[in-house]
């Protein structure tokens, strides 16, 4: 550190469970004579700190099995108190339905309420391998959301 005019340390306070991390970093910086900055990142929030609202669009072409709408609603309601990223939720819903139904084609699109002006609308699709639906899935993925909605027209 003697090769530099000034050395400064930065710690990001992002709501970590162990505040001891920040305390130890502060003490080490003080011992070394290093200026220490703590940047509060709590504005990012934790995964489960804020409720998320979404409209989930599910379209599928069945093969031999269909899902009853009441069962599907109960399954989707199980996500009410589930803390996870939007993308993970949509991917899990899609994979669960593929495993359950073995459909020819399936797509799941989550339209989540924007936070801070940023909209995250994850999309999952599946086409049964070796069928024309495999090509349909690829085509739909490439054409998906070419003209996304604006935040003010939801």
From Swiss-Prot:
Catalyzes the NADPH-dependent reduction of 7-cyano-7-deazaguanine (preQ0) to 7-aminomethyl-7-deazaguanine (preQ1). One of its GO terms (cellular component) is cytoplasm. This is Putative NADPH-dependent 7-cyano-7-deazaguanine reductase. Its main location: cytoplasm. It is an enzyme of class 1 (oxidoreductase). The active site is at residue 52. It is found in: Cytoplasm. It comes from the Bacteria. Transmembrane segments: none annotated. The gene is queF. One of its GO terms (biological process) is tRNA modification. Its EC number is 1.7.1.13. Substrate binds at residues 67-69, 86-87. Keywords: Cytoplasm, NADP, Oxidoreductase, Queuosine biosynthesis. Pathway: tRNA modification; tRNA-queuosine biosynthesis.
